[in-house]
């Protein structure tokens, strides 16, 4: 008989930095999931990624207190900020307060295309051109200029 799925949790955790402190500990602990087991597995899976980049993760937990999880690619906004040279870290730079009027940086179409290749699996796009348009739209919505 298959394990009974009780639910799922969606979190964004910095790559390689999962630990039992909030938000990870309380989110998993109140559902009876082994926190340290998850933290070790997540950190092992994300050790090849750049440390500190937020990674979306979907955790499915079952009636027998076991779990599975899927890591996704970093958010497009993080990749765009890095490509534009905006500050990431404790107090990251935000996008423009008035997108379309004020610009906070520039990204080239080649950078947008590279980000689209990375995000292709998570985007609702059939080909690279459609994914590139989605990422370019996100860049413009953040107040980044997309240049050739």
UniProtKB/Swiss-Prot annotation:
Source organism's superkingdom? Bacteria
Gene3D superfamilies assigned: Ribosomal protein L11, C-terminal domain, Ribosomal protein L11/L12, N-terminal domain
> Which family is annotated?
Belongs to the universal ribosomal protein uL11 family.
List the HAMAP family. Answer: Ribosomal_uL11 (MF_00736)
MF GO annotations: large ribosomal subunit rRNA binding; structural constituent of ribosome
Name of protein: Large ribosomal subunit protein uL11
How is the polypeptide modified once translated? Answer: One or more lysine residues are methylated.
- State the oligomer form and interacting partners: Part of the ribosomal stalk of the 50S ribosomal subunit. Interacts with L10 and the large rRNA to form the base of the stalk. L10 forms an elongated spine to which L12 dimers bind in a sequential fashion forming a multimeric L10(L12)X complex.
Under InterPro entries, the record lists: Ribosomal_uL11, Ribosomal_uL11_bac-typ, Ribosomal_uL11_C, Ribosomal_uL11_C_sf, Ribosomal_uL11_N, Ribosomal_uL11_N_sf
User: Function, please?
Assistant: Forms part of the ribosomal stalk which helps the ribosome interact with GTP-bound translation factors.
A GO cellular component annotation here is:
cytosolic large ribosomal subunit
Q: Name one GO biological process term.
A: translation
Give one Pfam family, short name only: Ribosomal_L11_N
What are the alphabetically sorted keywords of the record? Answer: Methylation, Ribonucleoprotein, Ribosomal protein, RNA-binding, rRNA-binding
Q: Does the keyword Membrane apply?
A: no
């Amino acid at each position: 008989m298959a394990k009974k799925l009780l639910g799922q949790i969606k979190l964004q955790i910095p790559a390689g930095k999962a630990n039992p402190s909030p938000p990870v500990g309380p989110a998993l602990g109140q559902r009876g999931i082994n926190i340290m087991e998850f933290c070790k597995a997540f950190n092992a899976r994300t050790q090849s990624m750049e440390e500190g980049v937020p990674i979306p993760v979907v955790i499915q937990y079952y009636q027998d207190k076991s779990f599975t999880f899927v890591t996704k690619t970093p958010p497009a906004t993080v990749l765009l900020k890095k490509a534009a040279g905006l500050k990431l870290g404790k107090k990251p730079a935000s996008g423009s307060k008035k997108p379309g009027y004020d610009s906070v940086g520039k990204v080239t179409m080649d950078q947008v295309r590279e980000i689209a290749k990375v995000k292709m699996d998570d985007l609702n796009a059939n080909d690279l051109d459609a994914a590139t348009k989605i990422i370019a739209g996100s860049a413009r919505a953040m107040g980044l200029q997309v240049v050739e």
